[in-house]
Structures are given as C-alpha cells and as structure tokens.
Amino acid sequence: MSLVLAVYGKGGIGKSTTSANISAALALKGAKVLQIGCDPKHDSTFPITGKLQKTVIEALEEVDFHHEELTADDVIETGFAGIDGLEAGGPPAGSGCGGYVVGESVTLLQELGLYDKYDVILFDVLGDVVCGGFSAPLNYADYAIIIATNDFDSIFAANRLCMAIQQKSVRYKVKLAGIVANRVDYTTGGGTNMLDQFAEKVGTRLLAKVPYHELIRKSRFAGKTLFAMEDQPGKDDCLVPYNEIADFLMQENPAATVPVPIGDREIFSMVGGWQ
C-alpha cells in the first residue's frame, strides 16, 4: 500500500521545488516514488524530468476522454533517481475548472492500478484556499504537508489549509504531518519566529527549515533537483532539511495531528501581536 502525501501552500511559496526535493530524498533512500503535479502550469515535475511533460488532460483530449484507451506510458515520465512524474494539467487560462482535472487524474490513477505500484505517491497541489477539486488529494492522502514562509500571507494561507485538513479528517484518514518552513532567512526574514508560534497554536510542528539560498533557486531554473546539482559551497547544508523530511516520512508511524485552525478574523489580530 502506497504512502500518499498531499503538499499544499500559498501560491509561489516554493511547493514544486520542495516537493521535487522531497521526492528525490525519498527515492535516494530506496522508495519508489510517483510525483503528481496538480496545477494547470504543469511544471511540478520539471526538476525531476527536466522537461514539461504531456499532461493527463492533453492525453485524454487525444482519445476523446476515453480513460480506457490510456496506459501509464501515455501520462508518466521517469526522471531523476527513477522517480515517475505525472502532470494533471488544466484548461486554457481563463476557462474551465482546474480542480476538475485533478479529480480526473485521480480517477485515471485508480483505473490504471497505480496506487499499488509505488511506495510513495506525492501530490503537489495548486492553491492556498482549497476548492473541492483541488482538495481531492486530501481524500486519498495519509498525510498533508504545508509549505510556508515566515510572513503573514503565507501563515494565513496555511491556516486556511488547516481548516480544509480538519474538515477532511472527519470523513477521511488524512492528518497534518507538519509545516515545512521554506526560504528561511535569519538575517532579514526573522527566521521562523512567526511560523513557530503558528505551529504551536494550531497543534502541529515544523518538519524542517529550508534555507533561503541561491543554489535552490538555480536548481529550479536548471530543471534539476538540488540533489542533481554539482557540488558547491552550501549544497550539503541545503540538502539537510529534505533528508530530514524523508527520514520522518519513512518511519513506521510518523507522528501527525488533526490541526485546530484559528478563525479568519482572530488570526488577523493574533498574528499582529507576534514578534
């Protein structure tokens, strides 16, 4: 049975880069991993495969949406460390529902019997306020992971995601594994002071602290995971948090919680008082 992860966070927070590096860390520790990009931009797997691969929606269009005519080879590309990548895709900008495509991708995975093929399935999901379609991965996930930075907008989005996870946990098995602090900067960004307080308030923990480092940004543009980049100063330190996350997830029963989110209005007044 696959370990299913759903990675969420505010738009532009670094979810795909973080997801790809978590997938890489897991794969290098021996896990067979499938990463699923759930964003119309279809660039989640770019650091893994080094290209923008064909999306599920594009493959379905080619067969007039007859799922039974598709095989795994039509929608899956294998990249770094043997990681398989799949991109849900989406409708043209300004039309259609991207969340619907996520649901279609989940259906296709089930029909192809892929849930039993992998040790880990990681959904990299668009969005900070989760609609029905984009929340679909939470129906299947064992654990949700929130990516956040040490600022109000990111924390507000994380709190909204905690609301979605709490709601889904009533009917489904999903729990929150924790928050990954991304782009941590102790010089100008306050480190993780606000994230630490938020995590304690909602009943979760910081899984790891990913530093703000130019090498991570460069790896994204290069179409590589950080693990695949040439050795250079700072690389080893940047790899530490991704390996910490992988080690945590590969435990027999990783500790996780159902978060207790803060009310929308309450969080505005509360965060303003955090230092």
From Swiss-Prot:
Component of the dark-operative protochlorophyllide reductase (DPOR) that uses Mg-ATP and reduced ferredoxin to reduce ring D of protochlorophyllide (Pchlide) to form chlorophyllide a (Chlide). This reaction is light-independent. The L component serves as a unique electron donor to the NB-component of the complex, and binds Mg-ATP. GO terms for biological process: light-independent bacteriochlorophyll biosynthetic process; photosynthesis, dark reaction. Mg(2+) binds at S16. Its EC number is 1.3.7.7. Homodimer. Protochlorophyllide reductase is composed of three subunits; BchL, BchN and BchB. HAMAP family: ChlL_BchL (MF_00355). [4Fe-4S] cluster binds at C97, C131. Its cofactor is [4Fe-4S] cluster. ATP binds at G12, I13, G14, K15, S16, T17, K41, N182, R183. The gene is bchL. This is Light-independent protochlorophyllide reductase iron-sulfur ATP-binding protein. It comes from Chlorobium limicola (strain DSM 245 / NBRC 103803 / 6330). PROSITE patterns: NIFH_FRXC_1 (PS00746), NIFH_FRXC_2 (PS00692), NIFH_FRXC_3 (PS51026). Keywords: 4Fe-4S, ATP-binding, Bacteriochlorophyll biosynthesis, Chlorophyll biosynthesis, Iron, Iron-sulfur, Magnesium, Metal-binding, Nucleotide-binding, Oxidoreductase, Photosynthesis. Belongs to the NifH/BchL/ChlL family. It catalyses: chlorophyllide a + oxidized 2[4Fe-4S]-[ferredoxin] + 2 ADP + 2 phosphate = protochlorophyllide a + reduced 2[4Fe-4S]-[ferredoxin] + 2 ATP + 2 H2O. One of its GO terms (molecular function) is oxidoreductase activity, acting on the CH-CH group of donors, iron-sulfur protein as acceptor. InterPro entries: NifH/chlL_CS, NifH/frxC, P-loop_NTPase, Protochlorophyllide_ATP-bd. Pathway: Porphyrin-containing compound metabolism; bacteriochlorophyll biosynthesis (light-independent). It is an enzyme of class 1 (oxidoreductase). Binds 1 [4Fe-4S] cluster per dimer.
